[in-house]
Amino acid sequence: MTDKSKEGGSSKLLYCSFCGKSQHEVRKLIAGPSVYICDECVDLCNDIIREEIKDVLPKKESAALPTPRKIREHLDDYVIGQEHAKKVLAVAVYNHYKRLRNGDTTSEGVELGKSNILLIGPTGSGKTLLAETLARLLDVPFTMADATTLTEAGYVGEDVENIIQKLLQKCDYDVAKAERGIVYIDEIDKISRKSENPSITRDVSGEGVQQALLKLIEGTVASVPPQGGRKHPQQEFLQVDTSKILFICGGAFAGLDKVIEQRVATGTGIGFGADVRSKDNSKTLSELFTQVEPEDLVKYGLIPEFIGRLPVTATLTELDEAALIQILCEPKNALTKQYAALFELENVDLEFREDALKAIAAKAMKRKTGARGLRSILEAVLLETMYELPSMEEVSKVVIDESVINGESAPLLIYSANESQAAGAE
């Protein structure tokens, strides 16, 4: 190796042994035994190694795909109830990733299609949580998009391609990683067209968005600007194959129960052959959702082509009071456990009495916000205590009972000196 160092008085001008740049042309020059390497060459080496690893990773991952039963068990740890939806999701997700890891065709040459998922359920029933938990279990990139912000290309709002850009951002613009990701599009029911008949006026945030999403969900090669695309317009666009991305669309579909009820209630036949139904034979929202058919979704405002791209439909049930109590204390990241952990950082125990849990669940049921409303109730109840506690000394325990939830009294503070008093500051 030729020595490119030059004597300059008492100091020696050093050069990178790999690219030949001097120490003044680079930010850092690392010295080894008679060898030097600059920071730019180190970055280049890292890129080369990363590319090598990327080619090896898919082979390693193929052995790690959990079975539908294992996926369901993992969902049970975080999501209460929704047994049918969990089973449907577990099978659909397993089949999707099995298809990716074994190629799109079988040994007999049979092409395997993609099964995207439609989640139908009332607000706060766990649609988003199910999608997030699946992505975390499979260790794949996950992004959420709000369908209400999407518009057709050329109009004010987000283009559908922005969804893929968000997914790329989650995995540092690694295209191969993004192509194995999961995209959850929330509020999908809000882009339904206003009537069953095609409109002659432009519907840029309804049917127009459904049309724009068609190819993306089914599978296309989307051109996405690279990181800092506007700063470096000369860079080539990244090509992302969306046929490998799993799309999960979710929505509350308010009013869909009326559409289903109307179809189910329509009796067939006349005379003795008529299907007679009692007026009192009314069904719950959850029972009606389980009877949903593609024709109901078309009547609701989704175009037939869009419904066809979402062949797997999972319906979620309304959460009753017992389920809300379970959600408060049973999952691994249950809200009561989260707040107990927060209080533990102050060296204080937090206890929720049984009657308090029932009162919280009853309050959430009245608000009709499902599990989503539980956190806001707890925040309001614990606000004063969390405000005062860091400034107080010798508090060892905080007890919450029904009267605290109903606003009739303040939380009970138990001091390490075995004294107890109400937390209300008079």
Curated annotation (Swiss-Prot):
SUPFAM superfamilies named among the record's database cross-references: Glucocorticoid receptor-like (DNA-binding domain) (SSF57716), P-loop containing nucleoside triphosphate hydrolases (SSF52540)
Binding site for Zn(2+): C16, C19, C38, C41
PROSITE patterns reported for this sequence: CLPX_ZB
One GO molecular-function entry: ATP hydrolysis activity
Keywords from the UniProt entry: ATP-binding, Chaperone, Metal-binding, Nucleotide-binding, Zinc
One Pfam family in the UniProt entry: zf-C4_ClpX
Residues that, per the record, bind ATP: P122, T123, G124, S125, G126, K127, T128, L129
Gene3D superfamilies for the chain: 1.10.8.60, ClpX chaperone, C4-type zinc finger domain (6.20.220.10), P-loop containing nucleotide triphosphate hydrolases (3.40.50.300)
One of the record's GO cellular component terms: HslUV protease complex
GO biological process per UniProt: cell division; proteolysis involved in protein catabolic process
ClpX-type ZB domain boundaries: 4-57
InterPro entries hit by this protein: AAA+_ATPase, ATP-dep_Clp_protease_ClpX, ATPase_AAA_core, Clp_ATPase_C, Clp_protease_ATP-bd_su_ClpX, ClpX_bact, P-loop_NTPase, Znf_CppX_C4
NCBIfam families per record: clpX, PRK05342.1
Family: Belongs to the ClpX chaperone family.
Primary role: ATP-dependent specificity component of the Clp protease. It directs the protease to specific substrates. Can perform chaperone functions in the absence of ClpP.
Quaternary data: Component of the ClpX-ClpP complex. Forms a hexameric ring that, in the presence of ATP, binds to fourteen ClpP subunits assembled into a disk-like structure with a central cavity, resembling the structure of eukaryotic proteasomes.
HAMAP family: ClpX
Name used for this protein in its record: ATP-dependent Clp protease ATP-binding subunit ClpX
Organism: Vibrio cholerae serotype O1 (strain ATCC 39315 / El Tor Inaba N16961)
Protein encoded by which gene: clpX
